[in-house]
Amino acid sequence: MAGGRRGGRAKRRKVCYFTSNGITHIDYKDVDLLRKFISERGKILPRRVTGTSAKYQRKLTVAIKRARQMALLPYVAGE
């Protein structure tokens, strides 16, 4: 199995949610938006999963951390 994919469908390129919707500022108080980028365990989802660009992934990380600090989002998921 040296290199390449075996059968299956070709991988579709993910599009950045923020650039496609024209969002330039990510607000830490917009909890509903931030929850889309957090796993059910409370972890921040990586770029390769969400498809966000590097610029907006950095802004998203800062916004999520601020929301956690202000107790708008949990650090870990509840039971």
Curated annotation (Swiss-Prot):
The keyword rRNA-binding applies. NCBIfam families: S18. GO terms for cellular component: cytosolic small ribosomal subunit. Keywords: Ribonucleoprotein, Ribosomal protein, RNA-binding, rRNA-binding. Belongs to the bacterial ribosomal protein bS18 family. It comes from Bacillus licheniformis (strain ATCC 14580 / DSM 13 / JCM 2505 / CCUG 7422 / NBRC 12200 / NCIMB 9375 / NCTC 10341 / NRRL NRS-1264 / Gibson 46). Part of the 30S ribosomal subunit. Forms a tight heterodimer with protein bS6. It comes from the Bacteria. InterPro entries: Ribosomal_bS18, Ribosomal_bS18_CS, Ribosomal_bS18_sf. One of its GO terms (biological process) is translation. This is Small ribosomal subunit protein bS18. Binds as a heterodimer with protein bS6 to the central domain of the 16S rRNA, where it helps stabilize the platform of the 30S subunit. The lineage of its organism: Bacteria, Bacillati, Bacillota, Bacilli, Bacillales. One of its GO terms (molecular function) is small ribosomal subunit rRNA binding. The gene is rpsR.
